[in-house]
Swiss-Prot record:
Role of this protein: Catalyzes the synthesis of the hydroxymethylpyrimidine phosphate (HMP-P) moiety of thiamine from aminoimidazole ribotide (AIR) in a radical S-adenosyl-L-methionine (SAM)-dependent reaction.
Catalytic activity entry: 5-amino-1-(5-phospho-beta-D-ribosyl)imidazole + S-adenosyl-L-methionine = 4-amino-2-methyl-5-(phosphooxymethyl)pyrimidine + CO + 5'-deoxyadenosine + formate + L-methionine + 3 H(+)
InterPro entries: ThiC (IPR037509), ThiC/Bza_core_dom (IPR038521), ThiC/BzaA/B (IPR002817)
Species in which this protein is naturally found: Desulfitobacterium hafniense (strain DSM 10664 / DCB-2)
Protein name from the UniProt record: Phosphomethylpyrimidine synthase
Length: 432
């Protein structure tokens, strides 16, 4: 049985117990959230050594890091290094988006080495394999699509992105309304090209029950991809995006009725004043299923700094209902991320997630900040470094800027606020 089926039968699984402990809640509380579809617990029966984590309403905001090869950079070793760096930086999930090299070997090694849940986009590999076979990208068959999906599930992917909501009707809406950037989702563009070439409905939509049967067998969580997500602010919250979201809402119910865990993916590029509306729409139209957002990026003009534009949007999105943030690295829109880009992306997204958890009242979030405040008041530098979201960087910067014997730090020097106020408040001053 899947975690959803177990939850509906009143069974608290060992995975639920482990995930609940990380949240500071009981297994029964988590079971109830999973049973009604407001939380998912992605844990493929074939992913050995997984540390189960739940995603959903009332739980801490989770962060995903995308890694994976490209045709230009097909080597496995750098991606395993990125996995290690992301996990060390506190990521909760990894997605392997590989399109270069030995994709099967890369995916299997990432799943084998990852202690956190792993997601994939099977359609990417189907497209690559079709191209390698000397055929046009639109010449992949229905059977090849579903065989590719089953292979990823069999290998242990805990969740898979599937672009089931990109239908002929949604594409007609796009044609009628128009957009600045049309379709920026790789999976969405592949499916659209396939449908227009064959003049047929999306097989992932048309044969959705076939997909559900595969997911049910391996207890794979479906992540319903947003193929019409906006790729720029000008396209945000438009007709094609919302029409697809309505379609995804109906697919959420069908998955849950079949006993399959399901979450929904969201935008994208969204201006600040539209983010809360987008989160409310998604939660309402998709029956409070967990919502997984890329960013959202709040401006289009900051290549090289999109980990910042994403963190701004992510904090607002998560505080408004999003449950899962996909990181964005400084390399977004520019090229494949390096190991350092991966770490920066994870930390930026974790900052956004934590800022939102403070608003949502997640257990332990407020206490973390309070402990930092107390450490600062006490001028306890080792404690401050320990409590930092990135202790390595904080410690390195502290050491580079200050001598161990200094009474004050180099920011304020003899004008230290702590020393000044201690003279009048009677608080002992230890020095920095």
């Amino acid at each position: 049985m899947t975690q959803l089926q177990e939850a509906r039968k009143g069974i608290i699984t060992p995975e639920m117990v482990q995930a609940a402990e990380l949240e500071g809640i009981t297994g029964e509380e988590l079971r109830q959230k999973i049973a009604i579809g407001e939380a998912v617990l992605p844990c493929n029966i074939n992913h050995q050594g997984l540390r189960p984590m739940a995603v959903g309403k009332g739980l801490s905001t989770k962060v995903n890091a995308n890694i994976g090869t490209s045709d230009a950079y097909p080597e496995l070793a750098p991606e395993l290094s990125k996995l290690e760096i992301a996990v060390a930086a506190g990521v909760h999930s990894i997605m392997d988006l590989s399109t270069g090299g030995d994709i099967d070997e890369i995916r299997r090694r990432i799943i084998q080495d990852s202690p956190v849940m792993v997601g994939t986009v099977p359609l990417y590999q189907v497209m690559v394999d079709t191209h390698k076979a000397g055929r046009g990208l639109v010449e992949m068959t229905d059977d090849e699509i579903f065989a590719g999906i089953e292979k990823h599930c069999r290998d242990g992917a805990d969740f898979i992105t599937v672009h089931c909501g990109v239908t002929l009707e949604v594409i007609q809406e796009l044609r009628e309304q128009g957009r600045v950037m049309d379709i920026v989702s790789r999976g969405g563009s592949f499916i659209t090209a396939w449908m227009l070439h064959h003049q047929r409905q999306n097989p992932l939509f048309e044969q959705y029950d076939r997909l559900l049967n595969i997911a049910l067998h391996y207890d794979v969580t479906l992540s319903l991809g947003d193929g019409l997500r906006p790729g720029c602010l000008a396209d945000a919250t438009d007709g094609p995006q919302i029409k697809e979201l309505i379609t995804l809402g109906s697919l959420v119910k069908r998955a849950q009725e079949a006993g399959v865990q399901v979450m929904v993916e969201g935008p994208g590029h969204v201006p600040l004043h539209q983010i809360e509306t987008n989160m409310q729409l998604a939660k309402t139209l998709c029956h409070n299923a967990p919502f997984y957002v890329l960013g959202p990026l709040v401006t289009d003009v900051a290549p090289g700094y999109d980990h910042i534009t994403s963190a701004i949007g992510g904090a607002i999105a998560a505080s408004s209902g999003a449950d899962f943030l996909c990181y964005v690295t400084p390399a977004e829109h520019l090229g494949l991320p390096t190991e350092e880009d991966v770490k920066e992306g994870v930390i930026a997204a974790r900052i956004a997630a934590h800022a939102a958890d403070l608003v949502k009242g997640i257990k332990g979030a407020w206490e973390w900040d309070l402990e930092m405040a107390k450490a600062r008041k006490a001028l306890d530098w080792p404690k401050q470094i320990q409590l930092s979201i990135d202790p390595e960087k904080a410690g390195r910067m502290r050491k580079a800027k200050n001598e161990d014997s200094q009474e004050r730090c180099t920011m304020c020097g003899k004008f230290c606020a702590y020393q000044l106020i201690s003279d009048y408040m009677g608080t002992p001053f230890k020095g920095c």
